[in-house]
Amino acid sequence: MKAVVLTLAVLFLTGSQARHFWQQDEPQSSWDRVRDLANVYVDAVKESGREYVSQLEASALGKQLNLKLVDNWDTLGSTFQKVHEHLGPVAQEFWEKLEKETEELRREINKDLEDVRQKTQPFLDEIQKKWQEDLERYRQKVEPLSAQLREGARQKLMELQEQVTPLGEDLRDSVRAYADTLRTQLAPYSEQMRKTLGARLEAIKEGGSASLAEYHAKASEQLSALGEKAKPVLEDIHQGLMPMWESFKTGVLNVIDEAAKKLTA
């Protein structure tokens, strides 16, 4: 249960309003994005699965067992469609409630992240500018050496490598220096962000407008209700699978009986 609640919390704490999965203009809710991705995946699985089932049924073994897998597969597909129709509204309600209850927390964290981004952006821009300047200087130094390689013979290759190696080492040292500088400059902001997030979570833990304990209790309650509503639908799935299993079992037993008769004849 904790893993489920933590996963849902991570999803909603991002607070992103990405574009629609199919690039429509209006942003989707978290539930709509998950539902669309799941539908695309399930449709692909259904199509590929039906193709494999059809191939198995058309094989010599399938004909001998008289499995009728395609009919059973279609029946199973209808059963899963009923599952989707029954559980879809319940799951959507759960997502919407959790998203609403974490809205304030996500807003505050996004605000803190944006503040840190604005403060650190000048450092990042400066590092990028210096890095590009070093790359350009490196290119200008290496270009004449590359021309020498094209114009010279193979015996100059070792000499060229000796000339290029120090330049590569200089570039590597520059990158390390920039990384160390950037790490030093960003360290205070990283510590500040860590403390801010810790304070946010501690305030919620101590019993703010919406505590983590309340989120856990509400999520547990919603998941329990979802489980109760899913029981009859899961029973339908079980009933849908039984004909396929019985058909397969009967076919296998018939093949065994025929083989036994041939051996004793």
Curated annotation (Swiss-Prot):
Gene Ontology cellular component annotations, sorted alphabetically: chylomicron; extracellular vesicle; high-density lipoprotein particle; low-density lipoprotein particle; very-low-density lipoprotein particle
Localization, UniProt: Secreted
Domain of life (superkingdom): Eukaryota
Sequence repeat residue numbers: 67-88, 89-110, 111-121, 122-143, 144-165, 166-187, 188-209, 210-231, 232-242, 243-265
Family: Belongs to the apolipoprotein A1/A4/E family.
Spans annotated as 10 X approximate tandem repeats: 67-265
Modified residues annotated as Methionine sulfoxide in this record: 193, 242, 244
Oligomer and partners: Homodimer. Interacts with APOA1BP and CLU. Component of a sperm activating protein complex (SPAP), consisting of APOA1, an immunoglobulin heavy chain, an immunoglobulin light chain and albumin. Interacts with NDRG1. Interacts with SCGB3A2. Interacts with NAXE and YJEFN3.
Keywords: Cholesterol metabolism, Glycoprotein, HDL, Lipid metabolism, Lipid transport, Lipoprotein, Oxidation, Palmitate, Phosphoprotein, Repeat, Secreted, Signal, Steroid metabolism, Sterol metabolism, Transport
Tissue specificity remark: Major protein of plasma HDL, also found in chylomicrons.
Taxonomic source organism: Tupaia belangeri (Common tree shrew)
Name by which UniProt lists this protein: Apolipoprotein A-I
PTM characteristics: Glycosylated. Palmitoylated.
Biological function: Participates in the reverse transport of cholesterol from tissues to the liver for excretion by promoting cholesterol efflux from tissues and by acting as a cofactor for the lecithin cholesterol acyltransferase (LCAT). As part of the SPAP complex, activates spermatozoa motility.
Secretion signal span: 1-18
Source organism phylogeny: Eukaryota, Metazoa, Chordata, Craniata, Vertebrata
GO terms assigned for molecular function: cholesterol transfer activity; phosphatidylcholine-sterol O-acyltransferase activator activity; phospholipid binding; protein homodimerization activity
SUPFAM superfamilies: Apolipoprotein A-I
One of the GO BP terms on file: phospholipid efflux
A Pfam family that the UniProt record links to this protein: Apolipoprotein
